[in-house]
C-alpha cells in the first residue's frame, strides 16, 4: 500500500542551497556598490585578489631545512630529542627584506627618467642652469688644479696616505660590512636560472642520479640520500620520496583549481548574469533559467554530450605517423650477405681444389714425358688454365695420343754393338721372365723335397744358372740386343692409376657456372655421333641455304635425339646421297656452276649433234644425262628424221616434278616457289610470253 502523504519528508539539496545563498550575497553586494559606490581603495582589492590567487611558493632554504630534519629523523640523531634544538632558520633574504628598508627599495622596479623628471632634477640640483659636460669637466679640472697648487708637498702626501689607509680599511671590513662596506668589490648575485639549476642538481643528487662537486655542505643529508636510494625500500617510503621530490602536491593544487573552474562553468551557462538586479522579477527569471538547464541535463543525461558540436582532436605526430619498420628488409639483407659470403668461401675452396688437381696433372704429365721420352708432348700448362672446350679437348687428345703415338714405326733398323761372351741362340718360347734372386734363408728346402739339391758344394746364396737349351749346332752364339731388352726389369703396372685422359676430364669437371645451394652447377656435355648428312664440306659451303634446307631442314639438324636415332639418320642420308640424280635435282646451283665452267673456257656454248641432249657433269665428276635418272643409262639410237622419244618423257617427268615453270635470270622456278616468295606467278608467266612474241615478231618485221 502506498504511504500516506503526510508521512513523506521534504529533502533539501544542501549544496544547491549554499550556492544560492552565496549568489544572493554577491547580488546584494553589487547592488549596494552601485548605489553608494566603492569606498575601498582599488589597491587593497587588487592586493587581496592577488594574495588569494597566487600560489604559495616554498623557499628553497626551507625545503633544505625540511630535508635536513627528515634526514635526522630517519637517522634517529640525538639532537631531535633536545628541547632547545632548532631545525628551521629564517632565510637571509626574508630577514634582510623585512629589517632593511634599503633592500625593499632595491627590489622595486627602477623608474625610467622622462624629460619632466630631468628638468625637475636640474632645477633642484643646479638651480635651473644647464651646463655642458665638457664645461663641467673643465671646471672640475681647474678646481683641482687650484686645490693642488694651494697645498704643499707634505699635505699632498698626507692626503694620499689617508686615502690609501681608508681603502685598506674598507677592504678589510668588506666581509663583515656586507652591503654597507666598500663599493669597489661587490658580491655578484646569482641569476634566477642559476638558482633553478642548483635546485635541480640538488634534487637529482637526492634521487641518486647525479653527483655534486662540493658534498661537504650536504653532509647532513647523506643519510637521507642513502635511505631513499636503497633498492629494498618499502612501497610507502618510495611513494613518499616520489611525492616530495617530484612535487606532486603542486599537481593536486592544479587539479583542484581545474575542478572549481569546471563547477563554475557547469553552474552557469550562457552569458554572465549581472549581479545588479533591481527587480524581483529578474530573480525569478534567473531561477527559472537554472531550473530549465537542470531539467535539460537530467532528461538528456544518457545521450552523447555536445552532440551538436563537431569535436576535433589535435593530431599526435609521435603516435599517428607510421613508424618505418624495416626488420624484414634487414633480415633479407643479412641472409643475402651470408649466402654471398658462403658462396665466396665455396668458390675459394673449389679454386684451391682446382689448383691442387692441376699440380697433380702436371706431375702426371711430367711422369708421362719421362716414360714416353717425348719432351714436347703437346700439352702445356697454359692449356690447363683456360676454360674447358670439348672440341679443343678432343684435338689435344688426338694430338697427344693419336695414331701417330700408337702406330709410330722406326724408319731405320737400329744397329746394336755386339758384345762378346753373349749367346743369341735362345729359345724365347720357353723364356719365363728374369730370374729373381730369392732369399734362401726365408724359404729353405727340406731334404725330402723333390727339388732338393744333394750337391754338397751347392750355395743357395749364389745366383742360379740360367736354363737354356742346347744349341743346334756346336757353335756358341751371342745374345741378341732384343733378348737383352726383354730381359730387363720392367715396372709393374698399377691397375688403380687413371689414364691421362681421365685426369683431364676430372680436372675440367671442376669448372662450374654457378653455385646453387652449396652445389656447383655446370652444363653437361654429351658425345654425339658425327653426321655429315651425305654431303661433303665443299658441297655444304657452296650450296644455297634453301637447297640445304630442302635436303635436310635446319630443325632436324639441331634436334636432340638419341644415339640410335642419329645412327639411323646417318645411314639414311648416306644412302640418299648415293642417288646422284636426286642430289642434282636438289642442288641445281652446283650443277649449273659445273656446266658453265667449260663454256666460259671456249667462249661458245658446246653443243653436240643431238642438240638438247647434252650431258651434265655429276657431283662426283662423271658425265651423265641432264634429266635422265640413273636407271636409264642405256638408250636406243635415235634416227635423224624423228624426234627422240626419251626427250618427251624427260620433259613430261620434269613437268610432273616442277609443274609449270617461269624463267627468271636464266633460272627456272616453279609457280609454288615464286608464290612462296610473295610473287605473282601468273603475271610473270604472261610477261615471259610477251617477251617471246616480241622476239618472234622482230625478225619478221626486219624481213
From Swiss-Prot:
Keyword entries, A-Z: Phosphoprotein
One CC-aspect GO term: nucleolus
One of the protein's GO biological processes: endonucleolytic cleavage in ITS1 to separate SSU-rRNA from 5.8S rRNA and LSU-rRNA from tricistronic rRNA transcript (SSU-rRNA, 5.8S rRNA, LSU-rRNA)
PTM annotation (Phosphoserine): residues: 93-95, 97, 136, 141, 163, 171, 280-281, 309, 622, 628, 639
Pfam family of the protein (one): Kri1
Compositional bias per record (Basic and acidic residues), positions renumbered to this chain: 27-42, 52-63, 155-168, 322-337
UniProt feature, compositional bias: Basic residues: 463-480, 640-656
GO function terms (MF aspect): RNA binding
Positions with biased composition (Acidic residues): 251-266, 417-438
Modified residues (Phosphothreonine): 91
Keyword flag Nucleus: no
PANTHER family per the UniProt record, alphabetical: PROTEIN KRI1 HOMOLOG, ZINC FINGER, ZZ TYPE
Protein name (record): Protein KRI1 homolog
Gene name of the encoded protein: KRI1
